[in-house]
Design a protein with these regions (language model features):
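Generic structural signal for residues positioned in beta-strands
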Residues: 28-30, 50, 95-97
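Short, Gly/Pro- and small/polar-rich lid/capping loops
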Residues: 2-42
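Conserved beta-strand positions in the central sheet of alpha/beta enzyme cores
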Residues: 59, 120-123, 188, 238-240
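Active-site mouth loops of central-metabolism enzymes
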Residues: 34-42, 93-108, 125-128, 133-137, ...
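Conserved N-terminal beta1-alpha1 strand-loop-helix module at the mouth
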Residues: 37-94, 106, 117-118
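A structural signal for the main folded, soluble domain(s) of proteins
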Residues: 111-113
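Catalytic core of soluble alpha/beta enzymes
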Residues: 129-241
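Residue-level signal for beta-strand positions within conserved beta-sheet cores that form or flank
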Residues: 27, 92, 209
Length: 241
């Protein structure tokens, strides 16, 4: 229970409920720690605070490295969801891409068949790592075969690859150069870090490889897109919502 003095509720949206005081927030809050099946961003236990408001449950679960000003924005979003609710939908359907995991090329057709007809975009996972870290043996050849199989099956679809920061700059340049004839829509986070992304992007341009570079894991905080742009590290950013 908080020892902070009672604070008056903040005004809510016009016509909506007032936002809660600290005491009201904590009265029905539930702290949880959920074990993760796969370690992600250095953690295998996800901590969260569940808040119960008049519009429903909300979740406050910033990553551990986030500072107070970043956590404040996350908390404000959680309170807004729980006390004011979500806005009404503006559309009934949203197009999504098919995803091909790091499977053998012979299995690609079966994976794509699960999505039915009309596939217009495919994300292909590449740079598979083993349980002990490091690329699995033969991953380069497997990646090339997998991507080429997707292109052969879907000659008119947009094809993008996602390495989840699994390559070194040299490995990324090597594989993306080899895939230049596939006509990739973009390569998502081929290497870790903004500096490495900028290096890969510059080397591909020097070689005449037109594949755009997308930043994903390198963008986690509000100022990161500016750093990516300043370094010339990417052509686009993948935003998780």
């Amino acid at each position: 229970m908080s020892t902070a003095p009672a604070l008056p509720p903040l005004p809510g949206a016009p016509g909506g409920p007032a936002l809660p005081s600290v005491e009201e927030l904590l009265a029905d809050a539930v702290a949880v720690a959920v074990p993760m099946r796969v370690r992600f961003r250095g953690t295998d236990l996800r901590h969260a605070l569940l808040l119960r408001g008049p519009a429903g449950w909300a979740e406050f679960s910033p990553f551990p490295e986030y500072g107070p000003h970043e956590c404040a924005a996350w908390l404000a979003a959680a309170i807004e969801a729980g006390w004011q609710g979500w806005p009404g939908p503006v559309r009934q359907t949203v197009p999504v891409n098919a995803t091909v995991p790091a499977v053998a090329a012979d299995d690609v057709e079966a994976v794509l068949a699960r999505y039915g007809d009309g596939i217009t975009a495919v994300k292909v996972k590449v740079a598979e790592h083993g349980p002990e870290g490091g690329l699995v043996p033969g991953s380069r050849e497997a990646d090339l075969a997998r991507v080429r199989r997707v292109r052969a099956l879907l000659p008119h679809a947009q094809v993008r690859v996602d390495a989840n920061a699994g390559w070194t700059p040299a490995e990324a340049v090597d594989v993306l150069t080899a895939l230049a004839d596939v006509g990739l829509e973009y390569a998502e986070q081929p290497v870790p870090g903004i500096t490495d992304l900028a290096e890969v992007r510059a080397e591909l341009r020097a070689r005449g490889v037109p594949t755009p570079i997308a930043a994903d894991e390198a963008v986690r905080k509000a100022e990161d897109p500016l750093a990516v742009a300043a370094a010339g590290a990417a052509d686009l950013i993948v935003v998780k919502v």
